[in-house]
Amino acid sequence: MTPVIIKNIECFITRPDRHNLVTVRVTTDQGVTGHGCATFQQRPLAVKTLVEEYLQPLLTGRDANNIEDLWQMMNVNAYWRNGPVMNNAISGVDMALWDIKSQLAGMPLYQLFGGKSRDAIPAYSHASGDTLDALFASVDALIEKGYRHIRCQLGFYGGTASGLHAPENPTPGAWFDQQEYMSNTVDMFRALREKYGWKLHILHDVHERLFPQQAIQLAKQLEPYQPYFIEDILPPQQSAWLEQVRQHSCVPLAMGELFNNPSEWHDLIVNRRIDFIRCHVSQIGGITPALKLAHLCQAFGVRLAWHGPGDMTPVGVAVNTHLNIHLHNAAIQEFIPRSAMTDKIFPGAPEVKDGFIYPPVNAGIGVGFNEELARAHPVMYRPHEWTQSRLPDGTLHTP
């Protein structure tokens, strides 16, 4: 096989709306360029530095054909490994290499993987509201668009301390009452089933806001309403408690968006403590490890529901789609509507049609990148308030 030599690796940060999106571009001597998602919304400049100061000199001049070898080199070259900054940087390069390989092959990426397992992947999006009526309106709007899987949230993840029994002069943060949240969530599921019956698949994200005993209690209370899945009912560092959650409830459990390395997901999968893996593909290092993770999951009956938030590039969204179209145990794809400017910077991104995302048709990942427009919307960073989650006594809690 003729070598395809890496000539340059660049990293771009653009903020077309409220998210800093990180994109890696790999240029080759064959005139083919590839793009990958490296978005770490909370630390974008750290990722850019790692790509341009460390990965670019490491990989320039090497053969882009050898994706597995290059991934292993990026992973171990710094000796310490598997953190979110490094994994996202590696992901950007890894996705770009797969993009290049499938372009040179003249086929969409999912075909390079081995072809499709399904005609289309079901999609879900988010409905929310401060009141049930507001939530119903949000759900109705998604049903009108053809969605039959909807993530529902009543209220949001924290606010000011006013209205809570909190100390004087409360520390700024996203204040959150766990008991109130649990009660409201059970009421929400009851109301949704009363209004929409059983044809609507309801998903819900706890966002790791509970203590283990509360997680067990909530799982038991939600069981009669048959959620499609409950996500992140516990934080990763408390995942051993999922065995006890399992013993008390058959509610399907999803977890993984915060995972960085195989030691975090291996035991949960082989011991069947979760039903859906929710890993963020760039957060675990890109397509190369995602394929390995997917095959491990299939052996133990765990289905795929890759994390797909608004703070990922359309390149990352398309990668999720290629994986989902190909992998037999893919279940569903999260989809967040994009701004018009985001679509101009990243033309060709996947869309939802009547609740489904269909196979991409262009060679490669299939999403373009307009550098000129991207540079017109530069990075803008501010500390994130929503990750400063506080309990009613002011204690910081996992966000």
UniProtKB/Swiss-Prot annotation:
Q: Which PANTHER family match?
A: D-GALACTONATE DEHYDRATASE-RELATED, STARVATION-SENSING PROTEIN RSPA
Q: Which GO terms describe its molecular function?
A: lyase activity; magnesium ion binding
UniProt lists the family membership as follows: Belongs to the mandelate racemase/muconate lactonizing enzyme family. GalD subfamily.
Which keywords accompany this UniProt record?
Answer: Lyase, Magnesium, Metal-binding, Plasmid
Residues that bind Mg(2+), according to the entry? 205, 231, 257
Q: Which SUPFAM superfamilies match?
A: Enolase C-terminal domain-like, Enolase N-terminal domain-like
Q: What's the protein name? A: D-galactonate dehydratase family member Ctu_1p00430
Report the protein's function.
Answer: Has no detectable activity with D-mannonate and with a panel of 70 other acid sugars (in vitro), in spite of the conservation of the residues that are expected to be important for catalytic activity and cofactor binding. May have evolved a divergent function.
The UniProt entry, under InterPro entries, shows: D-mannonate_dehydratase-like (IPR034589), DgoD-like (IPR034593), Enolase-like_C_sf (IPR036849), Enolase-like_N (IPR029017), Enolase_C-like (IPR029065), Mandelate_racemase_C (IPR013342), Mandelate_racemase_N_dom (IPR013341)
Q: Which residues bind D-arabinonate?
A: 207, 257, 278, 307, 334
Query: What is the species of this protein?
Result: Cronobacter turicensis (strain DSM 18703 / CCUG 55852 / LMG 23827 / z3032)
